[in-house]
Amino acid sequence: MYGYRERIGMILPSTNTVAEQEFFRMAPSGVSTHVTRVKLTATNPEGLKAMADNARRATDEMMSCLADVILYGCTSGSFLQGIEWEEKFRKELSAQAQRPVLTTANNCHQALQALGKRKISIATPYIDALNQAAYRYYTDLGYDIVCMKGLGIETATNIGKNPPHVIYNLGKSAVTKETQVLFLSCTGIRSIEILQQLQDDLGIPAFSSNVANLWACLRTHGINEKLNGLGALMQLP
């Protein structure tokens, strides 16, 4: 049976072509990933808010495959409306599903806490409005964002078209002498091929939204397996 250790149910933006593939490549033996999608019409605040309105329907679909944990796999879609909204959204969906429902924004917060770092650089594919929302969300959580760099991509399907070396260079450009950890934000960017090399070259921890999501899903279900080649986070309990 696939998923005899854990079944992860992932709710993705309809435009995302990366997260599913990265989970398939990263997940340890016995962990399966099952995906449903919510319509994203535009990569802007209005489009992301409309997408979140369909989360209940998608959660129902994930429950029908007996997922052990359900992941709302959109970073900007879960930080956009702030800390209180994210917490309420997560708790309401968890109550509906009668099992843990996680959000990417909070998983990345938990990853930063586990790494024990407060001075962060964030690299994103986002437009300015979403970068500003990310800045507010993580600053409100108590982090010192020393640098933020975005690609300014307006068309969601173009996010996943960036080859890994583009994300490598974007990540490097966001790091300053003050940076203690690099966060590659967005489940739609392809980064697992370069993440370990980027961390090694920078000499500081680096993680992506997708790595934080897998780490959180595994730990929620008591799977503490360390996965090599995916940065410092996947070496933590």
What do the PLM-derived regions correspond to, one by one?
Residues 168-201, 214:
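Hydrophobic alpha-helical
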Residues 153-158, 204-226:
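Short, flexible loop segments at boundaries between secondary-structure elements
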Residues 56-59, 101-116, 212-223:
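Hydrophobic alpha-helical segments within soluble ligand-binding/sensing domains
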Residues 52-65, 167-179:
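Short, well-structured alpha-helical segments in soluble
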Residues 59-106:
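Glycine/small-residue-rich loop that forms an oxyanion/phosphate-binding "nest" at active or ligand-binding sites
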